[in-house]
Swiss-Prot record:
Chain ranges of the GATase cobBQ-type domain: 251-448
Keywords from the UniProt entry: Cobalamin biosynthesis, Glutamine amidotransferase
Catalytic center residues: 332 (nucleophile), 440
Gene3D superfamilies, per the entry: 3.40.50.880, P-loop containing nucleotide triphosphate hydrolases (3.40.50.300)
Organism: Klebsiella pneumoniae (strain 342)
Designated name of the protein: Cobyric acid synthase
Length: 507
């Protein structure tokens, strides 16, 4: 019978996703076939499974921690906000529809049977499942139709561990208040608490822990310190909180424009891990002044973010950077914005809109969504400063609802190899300083990333660095560091005991 445990939080961004990854790593290290599961995820960071299905990035990196390939069953429902009130609904890896919050809340009960079937299929293949909730289980206005917190725990008949973030303050009130707002049968499922992101001497917490255990009857299983572990974040909360705001100087300064609807900012984790690079997410046009490379990232609302670029003055700042001969890269939505024209008769109804005019491309939005993993080769017609990247093999994935065509004579950036065919992708500007592509995950390819960075170093008169960071090994070390820290600070033996004690047959 499958062992299972669910991590729920007192709020969003308390560290559930990272701790789930840590448990997946620990169980994997202990020889258990383990998989993560989150019934419903709301995030703009998504990725593609080997069979071309779209799912949340959090469950992808949790699967990596467990030593397995991502499977869309690990995240059957993905909600991708397109505005403050509307979200694209992705079911089992494919776009189903778009809904506002009220409509989706009414629709959720229809999904319960499908969620349970998916969960049961995973339970039949794995020895341990680590479930993740969303936000807080104490959202009493959503309780009656819940499918991701206590509603999911009930379906899976699994115990719950509550995660609380002490760094934001009020941790004991958050624990007590969350438990107080749960129904008795829900509260009975909570078998432990983990206090996360602690800075300081844990002895100072001892009396508080004793009191909260006495008040609630729920044991505190551990206090996790604030860890400097480089793992992916689930959504834009970390960007808003300034987690990625770096002030230290590095040889290469890369400015990623922080679009209002930024998507897949995990593209730049591999860049940020490089020893000679500072990656900044910027909204102030003046912040582009010192950049050695400007990146327009992916977007879930290309035309809305293009409008913001102009209204905020960022488009003018990008043009000024171009005049200073600063290289410019657009990825996915950012690539679309760099073109001459965007024709949208599908999403916004805005019709034909001018792009930034940097690349000689025209984009037509379409109903069909391209979702695929691809292998690719860099073109041989790259500009001199990027010549070391010519012919290199890279890999990544595509997620976009649109097709971009180049003008005749405008060179592509990549040759994509998919379904037995070679397809041109991306574009390069006439001056060789601006380029775009639909390929996400490009910087995970070590040789390309080092070639790009050495090209930027050359432009600054700096000597190249010979060795490339092996990003896959780097991530593995981060997973192992996380697991080591959790074994040190959390009673993992008690978590095993909780899981074994509450093994129940699925309904």
């Amino acid at each position: 019978m499958t062992l299972a445990v669910m991590l729920q939080g007192t709020a969003s961004d308390v560290g559930k996703s990272v701790l789930v990854a840590g448990l997946c790593r620990i169980f994997h290290q202990d020889g258990l076939r383990t998989a993560p599961f989150k019934s419903q995820n709301m995030a703009l960071n998504s990725g593609i499974t080997p069979d071309g299905k779209e799912m949340g990035r959090a469950q992808i990196f949790q699967a990596e921690a467990a030593g397995i390939a991502p499977d869309v069953r690990m995240n059957p429902i993905l909600l991708k906000p397109t505005s403050d009130r509307q979200a694209q609904v992705v079911l089992m890896g494919q776009v189903a529809t778009s809904m506002d919050a009220v409509s989706y809340h009414q629709y959720k009960p229809r999904l319960r049977e499908q969620i349970l079937a998916v969960y049961q299929s995973l339970a039949g293949e794995y020895e341990a499942l680590v479930l993740e909730g969303a936000g807080s289980p104490a959202e009493i206005n959503l309780r009656d139709r819940d499918i991701v917190n206590m509603g999911m725990a009930e379906m899976a008949q699994c115990p719950v561990i509550l995660v609380a973030d002490i760094d934001r303050g009020g941790v004991f009130a958050a624990i007590y208040g969350t438990l107080a707002l749960l129904q008795p049968q829900e509260r009975a499922r909570v078998k432990g608490v983990i206090i996360n992101k602690f800075r300081g001497d844990v002895a100072l917490l001892r009396s508080g822990i004793e009191q909260i255990e006495a008040l609630t009857g729920v044991p505190v299983l551990g206090v996790m310190p604030w860890l400097d572990v480089d793992l992916e974040d689930e959504d834009g909360v970390a960007l808003q909180a300034g987690k990625y705001h770096r002030t230290d100087r590095r040889d290469i300064d890369i400015a990623v424009v922080h679009l209002p609807h930024i998507a897949n900012f995990t593209d730049f984790n591999a860049l940020a891990a490089q020893p000679d690079v500072r990656v900044r997410y910027v909204r102030d046009p003046q912040a582009l002044a010192d950049a050695d490379l400007v990146i327009l990232p992916g977007s879930k609302n290309t035309l809305g973010d293009l409008c913001w670029l102009r209204e905020s003055g960022m488009a003018h700042a990008v043009e000024q950077a171009r005049q200073r001969k600063v290289p410019l890269l657009g990825i996915c939505g950012g690539y679309q914005m760099l073109g001459e024209t965007i024709i949208d008769e599908v999403e916004s109804g805005l019709g034909t809109q001018p792009g930034l005019g940097v690349l000689k491309t025209v984009t037509h939005f379409a109903q069909h969504k391209t979702t695929t993993q691809v292998q690719a080769t860099l073109g041989t017609n790259l500009p001199e400063w990027l010549a070391d990247a010519a012919g290199l093999h890279v890999s990544g994935y595509e997620i976009h609802m649109g097709e971009t065509r180049r003008e005749a004579g405008s060179p592509p950036l990549l040759q994509l190899h998919k379904a037995g065919q070679s397809v041109e992708d991306g574009a390069i500007s006439d001056d060789g300083l601006a380029f775009g592509t639909y390929l996400h995950g490009l910087f995970d390819s070590d040789a390309f990333t080092r070639a790009l960075l050495n090209g930027l170093r050359q432009r600054k008169g700096l000597a190249p660095l010979d060795s490339a960071l092996e990003y896959a090994r780097y991530k593995t070390r981060q997973f192992d560091r996380l697991a080591d820290a959790m074994r040190e600070h959390i009673a993992i033996d008690k978590i095993y005991a909780i899981m074994r004690q509450h093994q129940e047959p699925l309904c």
